[in-house]
A protein has these predicted regions:
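Rhodanese-like catalytic fold shared by cysteine-dependent sulfurtransferases
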Residues: 4-6, 16, 23-24, 36-54, ...
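Cationic, low-complexity basic patches in intrinsically disordered or flexible, solvent-exposed regions
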Residues: 13
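Sec-dependent N-terminal signal peptides
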Residues: 25-33
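Short, surface-exposed ligand- or partner-binding patches at beta-edge/loop junctions that are enriched
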Residues: 99
């Protein structure tokens, strides 16, 4: 089947032509991202309440980390997780806060670490947001 013919035929299809498929996909995307945003907000609230002695992990690239990072943060790019934290001796029951530039990689990092058995992982989201939260929660 020729791709051009299939697209033409699909374009004439009632559901695609009327935009119902696109609307359904957008609705599903909004639903999924709102769930992630709610999880991140919950994590931020827990960070604000104060954690004992969390390991703060910057999951950005080495170059991004070199351009500036949160004081005391360790650089473990997303591609190396969870292995680099395990190799460093971070225990599965330690509090770990992950952050990045925009919040996308930190959400992925949280998922990877949870799947590896880390129990107390918090998504700090974007670096600028986490900096503000940490400053506000300092005594």
């Amino acid at each position: 089947m020729d791709l051009g013919r299939r697209i033409t035929r699909d374009a004439e299809h009632r559901y695609i032509g009327s935009g119902l498929m696109i609307r359904a996909l957008l609705s599903a995307l909004l639903f999924l991202t709102s769930g992630l945003a709610a999880q991140a907000a919950n994590d931020i609230a827990q960070i604000q309440q104060g954690l004992d002695s969390p390991v703060i992990v910057d999951v950005r690239s080495e170059g991004e980390y070199a351009s500036g990072a949160i004081d005391g943060a360790l650089n473990h790019p997303l591609q190396g997780l969870p292995g680099t934290l395990i190799d460093m001796g971070v225990e599965l029951d330690e509090e770990v806060i992950v952050y990045c530039r925009s919040g996308r990689r930190s959400a992925q990092a949280k998922t990877l670490l949870k799947q590896a058995g880390f129990q107390l992982v918090f998504d700090g989201g974007p670096m600028t947001q986490l900096e503000q939260v940490l400053e506000q929660s300092e005594p």
